[in-house]
Amino acid sequence: MNLKEHIRVIENFPKEGISFKDVTTILQDGKVLNYTIDKLAENLKDKKIDKIVGPEARGFLFGTPLAYKLGVGFVPVRKKGKLPYETISCKYDLEYGQDELQIHKDSIKKGDKVAIVDDLLATGGTIASVVKLVEELGGEVVNVSFVIELTDLKGKDKLEGYDINSLVQYNI
């Protein structure tokens, strides 16, 4: 299956000059969603993963079914103030300003082998923050997987030294 054929591209969204890659078309088609999760799982089958971690919000959409498929737990990473228990935080830069991500303190145990999953790799700032959170809790990031990678934005540069997979690549 050519997954790229199932990703809707919307030009000039959310603002002029942006070519938005819409993954909701993957989610709407059961066969395409199953294929996507199977391909993500294939990349992890020999990694002995303990947990899947996914950032808000679209990381939840692919991370949770992937965790189910692999028979492991899923850990959400959310924006500040959205998790109910004790958390640790990591700030990261946005185009204009900063944002902050949080993870529950008890969600990753020392030595847990963790795969991080998200829908899209752009500049890498969000995922670099997720990596920091996992490692601060003592987890070992053994893989970082994406459905889509925007190669021209060089997000992999912020993740140097980590095993990275993406199912579809776009040059923007």
Curated annotation (Swiss-Prot):
Q: Name one GO biological process term.
A: purine ribonucleoside salvage
Q: What class of enzyme is it?
A: transferase
Indicate yes or no for the key word Cytoplasm: yes
Origin superkingdom: Bacteria
Which EC number(s) does UniProt give?
Answer: 2.4.2.7
**Keywords assigned:** Cytoplasm, Glycosyltransferase, Purine salvage, Transferase
Its UniProt pathway annotation is:
Purine metabolism; AMP biosynthesis via salvage pathway; AMP from adenine: step 1/1
Biological source species: Clostridium botulinum (strain Hall / ATCC 3502 / NCTC 13319 / Type A)
Similarity annotation: Belongs to the purine/pyrimidine phosphoribosyltransferase family.
Q: Which Pfam families match?
A: Pribosyltran
Q: What is this protein for, i.e. what is its function?
A: Catalyzes a salvage reaction resulting in the formation of AMP, that is energically less costly than de novo synthesis.
Molecular function GO labels: adenine binding; adenine phosphoribosyltransferase activity; AMP binding
Q: Which reaction does it catalyse?
A: AMP + diphosphate = 5-phospho-alpha-D-ribose 1-diphosphate + adenine
Tell me yes or no: is NADP among this UniProt entry's keywords: no
NCBIfam families from the entry?
Answer: apt (TIGR01090), PRK02304.1-2 (NF002633), PRK02304.1-3 (NF002634), PRK02304.1-5 (NF002636), PRK12560.1 (NF009211)
**Name of the protein in question:** Adenine phosphoribosyltransferase
How does it associate, per the subunit comment? Homodimer.
Q: What cellular component GO annotations does this protein have?
A: cytoplasm
> Where is this protein found?
Cytoplasm
Its chief place of residence is: cytoplasm
